[in-house]
């Protein structure tokens, strides 16, 4: 799927998305964070800002969370840009979604190595689940219709019991609720933000204890990368979809694309 090198190549920002744009009175005034800048294909910047994760709560508006792709492409060309090649745009949309998933994993690796032991790094590392779901939404069309329509397996039942002594998940939930009721209201500035990050981390941990999920499968990953197994294999897409839904429901249950995927795939929670 790799397209030919861009000819001519142009300056690519590398992190061109709404979070790095300054706008005043309806006009773009600055673009921030140029540390990923390089020469390459202009489609890369256009696709990156259209990733679901950067639409900030508006997954229904595929162009930066602001509008339709058709209007975006037309405005880009009218402003002096080139015509958009849909195949190149799609390649970069898939590629940069995978790239960001690897970036999230890299943050977890940085935390483990001691290079950056900040709480934010280890929590952002769990956002890999968002990109796993987005990739399945992007790539599902490559599967045969019968596989796209195949019902999903049932979700894994919770392991939590409401009898006996409090479970580990309930202990974690109790700490999270204490932070919310006793600590967060009095926190100021960055401390208030970090309390929210800590609560998010505890929520992830509690849900993981309630529904233990370990879908790491290196043999399957290697087989998919080599092409030995594909989405045409009966039941594989349904299995991957269920795994992605369950993982994301535990890690980032408020991610907007989760509800979209459940609806499109006919999945129960």
Which residues does each PLM region occupy?
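C-terminal amphipathic alpha-helical interaction region
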Residues: 162-178, 182-196, 207-269
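An alpha-helical support segment within catalytic cores of ATP-dependent transferases
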Residues: 1-14, 25, 78-81
């Amino acid at each position: 799927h790799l397209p030919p090198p861009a000819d001519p190549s142009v300056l690519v920002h590398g992190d061109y998305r709404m979070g790095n744009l300054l706008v005043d009175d309806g006009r773009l005034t600055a673009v921030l964070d140029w540390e990923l800048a390089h020469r390459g294909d202009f489609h890369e910047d256009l696709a990156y800002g259209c990733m679901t994760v950067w639409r900030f709560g508006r997954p229904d508006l595929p162009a930066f969370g602001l509008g339709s792709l058709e209007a975006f492409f037309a405005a880009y060309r009218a402003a002096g840009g080139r015509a958009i090649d849909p195949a190149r745009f799609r390649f970069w949309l898939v590629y940069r979604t995978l790239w960001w998933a690897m970036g999230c994993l890299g943050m977890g690796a940085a935390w483990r190595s001691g290079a950056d032991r900040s709480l934010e790094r280890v929590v952002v590392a769990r956002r890999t689940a968002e990109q796993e779901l987005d990739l399945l939404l992007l790539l599902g069309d490559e599967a045969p219709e019968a596989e796209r329509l195949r019902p999903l397996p049932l979700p894994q039942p919770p392991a939590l019991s409401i009898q006996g002594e409090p479970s580990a998940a309930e202990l974690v939930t109790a700490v999270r609720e204490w932070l919310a009721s006793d600590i967060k209201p009095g926190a100021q500035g960055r401390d208030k933000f970090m309390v929210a990050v800590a609560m998010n981390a505890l929520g992830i941990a509690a849900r993981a204890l309630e529904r233990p999920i370990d879908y790491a499968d290196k043999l399957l990953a290697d087989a998919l990368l080599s092409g030995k197994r594909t989405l045409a294999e009966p039941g594989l897409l349904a299995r991957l979809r269920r795994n992605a839904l369950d993982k994301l429901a535990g890690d980032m249950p408020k991610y907007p694309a989760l509800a979209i995927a459940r609806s499109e795939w006919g999945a129960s929670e």
